[in-house]
Amino acid sequence: MLRLVTYYTDTHEEMARKYVMSRAWGFDERVCVRVEQSCPTGEFKSDGWNDCMIDKLRTLRNLPADNVPTLYVDADVCLFPTLVEWCRWRVEHMEPEEVAFSDDVLQWCAGIMLFRSSKRVHQFWDTLADLSRAWNLPDQEALHLLRMQTQAQKGTLPIRAQVLPRDVFCNWATIHQQPPAPWTGESFEIPKTCLAWHANWTVGITNKFKMLERVMLGETSNAAACTA
């Protein structure tokens, strides 16, 4: 059993359906949640962005605490055909309370997360939501600050955190030179090992669509041969 979860607002509906749900081959359960547009433009860190990220955490918190292996992806992630097999293999080697985040190069990325939907993990989503409100930060920055504070105090996070491999879960920053900078239309090659491409490090919804279309055109896997 493997569950796929995403959520979207009206500005991201086409993206969620085209790049995530229509390409969710092989997942046993597919959860796609529409939430109200708390961020009017849908643009990164614009007015209402933090509330939109709390909606993400609420979406995850509303899943059943059934310990089912779950892959969460943002609406701006393009899935590749054999992703489900890789995820099934990975969860076999995961600790019960582990959350594996994708790599944003500078910090962990909450745009792709693999975990078992357990009570402990639900409590972690609640903690992140509370910290996001208290610190007035979006979920990923709250996660980063929590991680830094925990390390400084030689403590432990309430979950076992891991990082997903960059060559499987890719984005512009993972394939670009250091230090990472936003994509401005440069050509790029998709690693042959890529199974999910996240259009972060990309400013604006229009540019995200442009990037994801390039990803679909340059995809090395034979998506047309796969069935839902």
Where are these regions (language model features)?
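Catalytic core and acceptor-binding pocket of nucleotide-sugar-dependent glycosyltransferases
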Residues: 121-228
